[in-house]
Amino acid sequence: MLDLTYETPKPKVIAGAKHDWELVIGMEIHAQVSSNAKLFSGASTTFGAEPNSNVSFVDCAMPGMLPVINDFCVAQAVRTGLGLKAQINLVSAFDRKNYFYPDLPQGYQISQLYHPIVGEGEVLVEMGPGVARLVRIERIHLEQDAGKSIHDMDPNLSFVDFNRTGVALMEIVSRPDIRGPEEAAAYVAKLRQILRYLGTCDGNMQNGNLRADVNVSVCRPGDYERYQATQDFSHLGTRCEIKNMNSMRFIQQAIEYEARRQIAILEDGGKVVQETRLYDPDKGETRSMRSKEEAHDYRYFPDPDLLPLEIEQAWVDEIATSMPELPDAKKARFMADYGVTDYDANVLTAELDAAAFFEAVAKGRDGKQAANWVINELFGRLNKQGLTIAEAPVSAAQLGGVLDLIASGEISGKMAKDLFEILWTEGGDPAEVAAARGMKQVTDTGAIETAVDEIIAANPAQVEKAKANPKLAGWFVGQVIKATGGKANPAAVNQIVAQKLGL
């Protein structure tokens, strides 16, 4: 397999009115666990159900109802940890995070502060060919999601939908290793890609199944290196947390604004206040939500209703044996086995379905040609029509059949595109459609020679020009292909034209 090595990108430098500044970003990603049932109850997790229809007595904190851990959610967290090359903790525990909010019926959230199920891991975030940032994962813990408060249905009333209450979340906490807005968005995209490959979260940001809390601070050049040497976070400046970001574009915009806001405060001699902020995409700015709480503000303590969670190494090993090939490994293999470029490999492995489609087309064929057709023809058409790979009218077998006809010399590249169009709109077997439509390339050298002789005889002036400038021989090739209705084999035409003109 191809061994890919990378250089570390330089941090983003922002020029203030008085000084240069660098960005420091850490992220907490809340990923909804792909599970049919909630973390501590059997209630459904179906999105878009009638309000308060997916709620059990446990979810709405009825007296006497006790939580029971969903083993599948635990397995999904372990699977995620393995996918992020993280330490799996065989003993973890649940804690109560105490705060009042209308959509939190228990009056506390069950989380894992002191003993998370997953420890330190890492994510490699590519920022261009040969350039990547290694982002360290501090921890992954399981916790409950809250419900949804609705304030815009009535001018005098607020409503609460508890369907989301108790749904399992994985909170994936990074170290402050991200150094720019583009890196932050790329980190979320890479994490989402890995989770989708693993099948542990669908990554649907629009539905709120993947949300990001972004911690932003600014420091002077050299301060980050001092932090690395001492692990003293004071070198990184005072951070502000931007909550519940559900768009890559908004994440970048919010970081850009927040960095400028903090720089302006510091250069005016002020101090940045540690707080939680929200991003308003309509105004393109962050605004204060509340002062930033510390762990002690939530009065964490071990949940007395739940025993420590103990798992066996043999079970972890069993999950490890079922792990799929992940994006980085698949990319390296595609480049090594099929000869595709770094860029093409990234495109082809972006989604698991797309990678599987490409591999089905490329197996036993020219990998570069397969990549070209899948990316330019198939993906181009899908994007134009707003379709997913699963909705593609042309199957991998059909596209592979088109490439086989090109390889055998039966059809030209132009014919292949016409054939692809017919398959897209009408379907059918490529070979049968090509035969029925008379889409067969002329490879008979005698017929091609006759056509070349006729074109040369009719254009003596062009012959002299081509002999003086061999590049003009292409004109004859074009005329012959045109005369044969596009059916003449271009390679054969080129060879015969060159021979006839004495080039």
Swiss-Prot record:
GO BP annotations, alphabetical order: glutaminyl-tRNAGln biosynthesis via transamidation; translation
Documented EC number(s): 6.3.5.-
Keywords noted in UniProt: ATP-binding, Ligase, Nucleotide-binding, Protein biosynthesis
Tree of life domain: Bacteria
Alphabetical list of InterPro entries matching this protein: Asn/Gln-tRNA_amidoTrfase_suB/E, Asn/Gln-tRNA_Trfase_suB/E_cat, Asn/Gln_amidotransferase, Asn/Gln_tRNA_amidoTrase-B-like, GatB, GatB_C_1, GatB_Yqey_C_2, Gln-tRNA_amidoTrfase_suB_CS
Top-rank EC class of the record's enzyme: ligase
Keyword match ATP-binding: yes
Pfam families named among the record's database cross-references: GatB_N, GatB_Yqey
Single GO MF descriptor: ATP binding
Annotated catalysed reactions: L-glutamyl-tRNA(Gln) + L-glutamine + ATP + H2O = L-glutaminyl-tRNA(Gln) + L-glutamate + ADP + phosphate + H(+); L-aspartyl-tRNA(Asn) + L-glutamine + ATP + H2O = L-asparaginyl-tRNA(Asn) + L-glutamate + ADP + phosphate + 2 H(+)
Keyword Transcription: no
Subunit organization: Heterotrimer of A, B and C subunits.
PANTHER family the UniProt entry points to: GLUTAMYL-TRNA GLN AMIDOTRANSFERASE SUBUNIT B MITOCHONDRIAL AND PROKARYOTIC PET112-RELATED (PTHR11659), GLUTAMYL-TRNA(GLN) AMIDOTRANSFERASE SUBUNIT B, MITOCHONDRIAL (PTHR11659:SF0)
Role this protein plays: Allows the formation of correctly charged Asn-tRNA(Asn) or Gln-tRNA(Gln) through the transamidation of misacylated Asp-tRNA(Asn) or Glu-tRNA(Gln) in organisms which lack either or both of asparaginyl-tRNA or glutaminyl-tRNA synthetases. The reaction takes place in the presence of glutamine and ATP through an activated phospho-Asp-tRNA(Asn) or phospho-Glu-tRNA(Gln).
Similarity comment text for this entry: Belongs to the GatB/GatE family. GatB subfamily.
Protein name, entry field: Aspartyl/glutamyl-tRNA(Asn/Gln) amidotransferase subunit B
Organism: Cereibacter sphaeroides (strain ATCC 17025 / ATH 2.4.3)
